[in-house]
Regions:
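Bacterial N-terminal signal peptides
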Residues: 1-8
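Boundary regions of SH3-family modules and the immediately adjacent low-complexity/disordered segments
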Residues: 17-22, 30-38, 45-52, 59-88, ...
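Conserved beta-strand/loop element in small beta-rich adapter and peptidoglycan-binding domains
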Residues: 35-52, 96-117
């Protein structure tokens, strides 16, 4: 675990970013004339791998590459995204806690990281609803 964290920090110029706007278009190339490949929602975490002017080349949890304008991102907080469909979000940190009313959620559901307690992460969605999720079930950047 320590090694993975070290590699992320010391590896090339990869940088953790979060979508800060309600919606964001991820494109095939750097510019609005390039095809829109995916529209993501607030708090989607991405990893910056390159830059061309005001455009960032980014990688998602699946390793797919896109381009997005720098004004769509923030580094002020960490974000997380669900890695698989039908993932339970809970009222507290542990399986003894009940799932929240809006659980389960599917892959690509994005959230802001609030805090970590052992192997559980408290998250908040774009509507301001909070829940807990088991750390191995999310990709955090």
């Amino acid at each position: 675990m320590v090694t993975a964290a070290f590699l992320f920090v010391s590896g090339n110029s990869a940088e953790a970013l979060c979508i800060k706007t309600k919606k964001a278009n991820l494109r095939k190339g750097p510019g609005v004339k390039h095809e829109k490949l995916w529209e993501v929602l607030k708090y989607m975490p991405l990893q910056k791998v390159a830059r061309k002017g005001a455009w960032y080349k980014v990688k998602d949890l699946d390793g797919d590459i896109y381009w997005a304008h720098q004004k769509l991102f923030t580094k002020k907080f960490k974000c997380a995204v669900i890695k698989q469909d039908k993932t339970n979000l809970r009222t507290g940190p542990g399986t003894k806690h009940k799932p929240v009313e809006w659980s389960p959620v599917d892959k690509y559901f994005s959230m802001k990281v609030m805090r970590v307690k052992n192997n559980w992460v408290e998250v908040m969605d774009a509507a301001g609803d909070k829940a807990w999720v088991h750390r191995p079930l999310i990709w955090i950047r």
